[in-house]
UniProtKB/Swiss-Prot annotation:
Residues 437-457, 765-780 have a biased composition (Low complexity). GO terms for cellular component: membrane. It is a multi-pass membrane protein. The modification Omega-N-methylarginine is found at residue 780. Keywords: Glycoprotein, Membrane, Methylation, Phosphoprotein, Signal, Transmembrane, Transmembrane helix. This is Proline-rich transmembrane protein 3. Residues 297-302 are annotated as: O-glycosylated at one site. The chain crosses the membrane at residues 475-495, 502-522, 543-563, 571-591, 599-619, 639-659, 680-700. Residues 1-27 form the signal peptide. Residues 411-427, 972-981 have a biased composition (Polar residues). It comes from Homo sapiens. The gene is PRRT3. Glycans are attached at residues 329, 363, 379.
């Protein structure tokens, strides 16, 4: 029989294969020159199919291109001249066009073990990219599996212009295949990296090679691993432009072929992929080629039941009619839907979702047939190979995406660029977890879980990883530093065991609180090590706060209690309130399981603490503004003001920390930066607060310091200046020195600080003592009494020559009275309203007033003469410088009866003039004074002169008493108009 045109077509097609780039480069993953690309093919025996036509077997040996063409005489073929000699060039890679393979030869499933590697075009690396040098050496080193002849299935994808190769080696017992490997097949075998288990001869009855033209998404489920039951679905996802029909074959249908994507990583064993099964011939109906004009087009129907082959066995297993591909004009406008093929009688398996891949909506997500699916699974081939570890998908710039890409993940450093490997674990009888959809992935940032759900728990390890060395520094630093206020309080107790009780109580409270806080931080800080338990940790955490607060109240009551109302000054009231405070906190922490009750108790505790702190600040302000600013109070108001401010801040932070202390039932406390900030500053405030209270307790319990240091006083005056209108030093007499008794200014007693004159046993001034005698010698007569002769009295200086400057400090008024007028002229003092000595009832205006220049008009009363007796020695020595005034010589009527008969009885108390500052003109002596300022002297004892009878008789009575005291020739000065001091 003459050779048919179909044989010529097959021969020409096989001759064009080396020119189309189907050589060894297909198994390598990188482009190679098309001129040197060849692929050997080995024929085999094939049984007849059930469709009515024999399977097409192509013998592609160059020696006999059409040896078996007579077997295909009953099949229509296209003439050779109508077949395209060379496909249309495409930037994505070459494409093959040819007749469809017979379906009858593929009824039995064949395990496919080679990994698909898509051939790359000369201008694009596509999905895989070039191989590394290390990968190239490893692939060259792998020896081919010594099993039968390779079966190459060429699966050209028309839109991508790429050729996908699947190597199907038969088993060792295959008897229908004969022949030897050609020499050029050794290169292909060296590049084949797949190994398959032995299969029976009945498992391999397909053609040695099959040319299938398809379009659309290409998927294949494979089994990988070494000994597990995981199924790895590797998918080469096509974009929307992948569904474009080739102009040379506009009516080509969509056939889901089988592919394996394989990537060899250096240092790792190659992935072993085993195909589940190849669809039998009944499932892939083929229409006969139709002749349309001068072109030959091969149409392949969709997996749905065609009208001519409605009696296929797997048609009834399909859930419904499968849609066919859209026409070529509509294909580029919308993406193609993934096809569902019934494989080995099982329920169709949808492709595994790949991040960033194109998938039409409505694709079923289930990868495992449900229990109600009727499809049988008789020839399912599952090799017991372990599952490999899943690799992360790697993003690339040119990847087609229909939804926002997933966050980039780190891929292995040796993985190929552009490769997608999807691994799913298949558990028998359990559906996999639902995959996230595009909408959920897009809304993930907006609906992200709160920070508490993902934050690390409050445990030592996570806190140390998050905070690094700050965590240990905080824990151990605070635990050790709290020992310092404890030591200060212990020192206060040891130094003054007999001090004030409130100060000792405050020291004990500070000692206990500091010890508890230090123990809590060093044993189980914030419950991170779970050593104390929940209840024990709460007790140690909350108890120091009421202790420090009670210590502050005790010190305030001790130092500033005077400003409180009397009912609040009772220490027993403070003790009762402190006891209720501490016991309430302990009871709620140990017994309550309701977090709301614990928070309420903490709120009341912090409110009481804030009230005590504010009261302390108010009392300190009142004391600093009203009272003196010395360190006489213990403890001082300034130190208590600092402690009150720290207590107020600590009360607020204690309430904020309670929000994390009681997270609620079933909730675990988790780390947050707000938690860290609150607890960090709260520990620092507690430490400073305890130090201030310990210092205040030491200041209250220690002995009182003698004086204030001058340098420290200056610093305090600079730091706290006195308010305007207030004097730093109170106004006190210059000779009054307040002792340490701190008496008030109104209760000053200056009698103790006065310098008293010596007793009246002082001697008279003698010439040997000099003219500048002491002021104490004035007014002190001799002890001999009136019988003292005049010879014993020496000359004395005048009042202007006397040294009346007293030693300092001295009360000047009392010194003047004691020096001039003691028991002489006035009763008590010249500066006070008093009568003369000896008067039973002094007249109302009889008091001597110290006014200057007073005119001598006052009359001498009855007792006036008795004042000037011989006992006055200081005034009797005054020299007479002028005539005696008339008012002194003439005594008025009514006064003579009470006179003592002395010439001194005529002395007038109104004639005394006192000049307080005799040297105010800057003059050096008395003689240089102005005339009006010169002191006028009086002759107290004038010489006897003839006078009227009454006067003479009166003077005679008086001279009888005075004459024995001295000679008549001696003049004595009784007084002067002006006494200069």
């Amino acid at each position: 029989m003459a050779s048919s045109p179909w044989g010529c077509v097959c021969g020409l097609l096989l001759l064009l294969l080396p020119l189309l780039g189907t050589g060894p480069a297909l198994g390598r993953g990188f482009p190679r020159p098309l001129e040197n690309s060849e692929i050997p093919m080995i024929p085999g025996a094939h049984p007849k199919g059930s469709v009515g036509s024999e399977p097409q077997a192509f013998d592609v040996f160059p020696e006999n291109p059409r040896a078996d063409s007579h077997r295909n005489s009953d099949v229509r073929h296209a003439p050779a001249e109508e077949m395209p000699e060379k496909p249309v060039a495409s930037p994505l890679g070459p494409a093959l066009y040819g007749p469809k393979a017979a379906q009858g030869a593929q009824r039995e499933r064949l395990p496919v073990t080679d990994d698909l590697q898509m051939a790359q075009g000369p201008s694009s690396h596509g999905w895989t990219g070039p191989l590394d040098s290390q990968e190239l050496l490893q692939q060259e080193a792998v020896a081919p599996h010594p099993v039968g002849h390779p079966h190459l299935t060429f699966i050209p994808t028309t839109p991508r212009r790429q050729l996908r190769v699947a190597t199907v080696p038969p088993s060792l017992q295959h008897e229908g295949q004969e022949g030897q490997w050609p020499p050029r097949d050794e290169g292909l075998k060296a590049k084949t990296k797949s190994r398959v288990p032995p299969t029976s001869p009945s498992d391999h009855q397909g053609p040695p090679h099959t040319l299938v033209s398809h379009s659309g998404t290409v998927k294949r489920p494979v089994l990988e691993g070494q000994g597990g039951f995981e199924e790895h679905l590797q998918e080469a996802a096509q974009g929307p432009h992948f569904t474009q029909q080739d102009p040379a074959a506009p009516d080509v249908g969509s056939v889901p072929p089988v592919e394996v994507v394989y990537s060899q990583e250096p240092g790792a064993q190659p992935d072993l992929a085993l195909a589940r099964s190849l669809p039998p011939a009944e499932e892939l109906p083929v229409e006969t080629p139709k002749r349309a004009g001068a072109e030959v087009s091969w149409e392949v129907s969709s997996p749905g039941p065609p009208p001519k082959q409605a009696d296929l066995p797997d048609a009834k297993d399909s859930p419904g009619p499968q849609p066919t591909d859209p026409p070529a004009s509509e294909a580029p406008d919308r993406p193609s839907k993934p096809e569902r093929a019934a494989m080995n009688g099982a329920d169709p398996i949808s492709p595994q979702r790949v991040r960033g891949a194109v998938e039409a909506p409505g694709t079923p997500k289930s990868l495992i047939p449900g229990p109600s699916d009727p499809g049988p699974a008789v020839n399912r081939t599952e090799s017991p190979m372990g599952a490999l570890q899943p690799d992360e998908a790697e993003e690339w710039p040119g990847r087609p995406q229909s939804h926002p890409p997933a966050p980039p993940v780190q891929a292995p450093s040796t993985s190929r660029r552009g490769l997608i490997r999807v691994t799913t674990q298949r558990a028998l009888g359990q559906p996999p977890p639902p995959e996230p959809t595009a909408s959920s992935m897009a809304s993930a940032p907006a609906s992200s879980p709160p920070a508490n759900a993902t934050a690390p728990p409050l445990r030592w390890g996570p806190l140390r990883r998050v905070l690094s060395f700050s965590w240990e520094l905080h824990v151990y630093g605070v635990g050790v530093l709290f020992l310092l206020p404890a030591l200060l309080a212990l020192a206060a107790l040891a130094a003054a065991p007999a001090g004030p009780r409130l100060a000792l109580v405050a020291a004990v409270l500070v000692l206990v609180a500091s010890a508890l806080r230090s123990a809590y931080m060093l044993t189980d800080p914030y419950g991170s090590q779970a050593r104390l338990g929940v209840r024990g940790g709460l007790v140690l955490y909350n108890l120091p706060f009421p202790l420090l607060l009670t210590a502050l109240a005790a010190l305030t009551l001790l130092g500033l209690g005077a400003g409180l109302p009397p009912p609040l000054q009772n220490p027993l009231l403070l003790g009762a309130v402190a006891l209720v405070h501490g016991v309430g906190l302990l009871a709620t922490d140990l017994l309550s399981t309701w977090s709301v009750l614990n928070l309420l108790t903490q709120g009341l505790s912090c409110a009481w603490g804030a009230a005590v702190a504010l009261g302390t600040l108010c009392l300190c302000r009142r004391r600093l503004l009203d009272g003196p600013r010395g360190w006489d109070a213990s403890p001082g108001p300034r130190l208590l003001a600092v402690a009150g401010a720290l207590g107020l801040l600590a009360s607020g932070l204690q309430l904020a920390a309670a929000l994390w202390l009681y997270p609620g039932p079933g909730r675990v406390g988790r780390f947050s930066w707000a938690w860290w900030g609150v607890h960090f500053w709260l520990r620092l405030l507690e430490l400073t607060w305890a130090l201030a209270l310990a210092l205040a307790a030491v200041a209250a319990a220690r002995p009182r310091p003698p004086t204030e240091h001058a340098c420290w006083a200056k610093l305090m005056r600079l730091a706290c200046p006195a308010p305007s209108g207030k004097s730093e030093v109170p106004e006190r007499p210059n000779n009054c020195y307040a002792g340490p008794s701190n008496v008030g200014a109104g209760s000053l007693d200056i009698s103790k600080s006065l310098i008293r004159n010596p007793a009246e046993s002082g001697q008279l001034a003698t010439p040997s003592s000099g003219a500048w005698g002491s002021a104490a010698s004035l007014g002190r007569g001799p002890q001999g009494g009136p019988g003292l002769s005049r010879n014993g009295v020496g000359p004395a200086p005048s009042l202007s020559e006397l040294d009346l400057r007293p030693p300092s400090p001295i009360n000047l008024s009392r010194s003047i009275d004691a020096a001039l007028f003691r028991e002489h002229l006035v009763r008590d003092s010249v500066f006070q309203r008093c009568g003369l000595r000896g008067l039973a009832s002094p007249p109302p205006g009889g008091a001597l007033r110290p006014r200057r220049g007073s005119h001598p008009k006052a009359e001498l009363d009855d007792a006036g003469s008795s004042l000037l007796r011989g006992r006055c020695r200081s005034l009797s020595d005054v020299r007479v410088r002028g005539p005696v005034p008339q008012h002194v010589v003439e005594a008025p009527d009514g006064a003579a009866a009470a006179a003592s008969g002395s010439s001194l009885d005529s002395f007038s108390r109104g004639s005394l003039k006192i000049s307080w500052n005799p040297w105010r003109h800057g003059l050096s002596s008395v003689d240089s004074l102005p005339l009006d300022e010169l002191p006028s002297t009086v002759q107290l004892l004038p010489a006897p002169t003839p006078a009227p009878d009454s006067t003479a008789a009166r003077q005679g009575d008086g001279q009888g008493e005075v004459q024995p005291r001295g000679k008549p020739g001696e003049s004595r000065s009784a007084s002067s108009d002006t006494i200069e001091l």
